[in-house]
Amino acid sequence: MSSTVISAPLTFDRSKKYRLTAAYFAAFVALGLTTGSLGPTLASLAEQSHVGLSAISYVFTVRSVGYLLGSVRGGKLFDRRPGNPVMAAMLILMSIAMALIPLTSTLWLLLLVMFVLGAAEAGVDVGANTLLGWVHGNRVAPFMNAMHSFFGVGALLAQLSWPRLQD
């Protein structure tokens, strides 16, 4: 069974390069939001799942296992499929998982959703890093640094917004 590997860097006009770059930056804000939201919501998730804090801590492990497996699978997926549609699918999956979290009433269901969330987050992480490199080629360094700064923006927004959501 043969597979096609997309060669990099791709050639785009300047306008398209910057539109794609802005989209990858926005994806990293979303990634920061989802990643940064777990800590502040931990006590609420434990209450919602009817378990103690020691049991709810499994969400960290399960989400990380999902992230690990999603990273491995995501790398192969971005090599074999058009990257932007895969990235869009991962963002949609991440959004669905985040929307399902408040609806889970048992720990096992929450762990399943967190596993999927971790895998989707990994797909966004791997995808944005890969695609940004393909768009900018050897000149990717400042864009890569900026993109990872946008992760921090999302994580900060998650911390700042949680107290307001509780009211």
Regions found by a protein language model. Name each.
Residues 63-65, 152-154:
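Short hydrophobic/small-residue motifs within alpha-helical transmembrane segments
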Residues 69-108:
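Conserved MFS/SLC helix-loop-helix module at the cytosolic interface between two early adjacent transmembrane helices
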Residues 19-51, 129:
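Extracytoplasmic
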Residues 42-43, 74, 154-166:
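Small-residue (Gly/Pro/Ala) motifs that create kinks and tight helix-helix packing interfaces
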Residues 113-149:
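Cytoplasmic helix-loop-helix junction between adjacent transmembrane helices
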Residues 46, 50-57, 145:
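Small-residue hotspots at the loop-to-helix junctions and early N-terminal turns
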Residues 23-24, 106-114:
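Short hydrophobic/alpha-helical segments at membrane-entry points of transmembrane helices
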Residues 32, 36, 118-126, 156:
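Small-residue-rich segments within alpha-helical transmembrane domains of MFS-like 12-TM solute carriers
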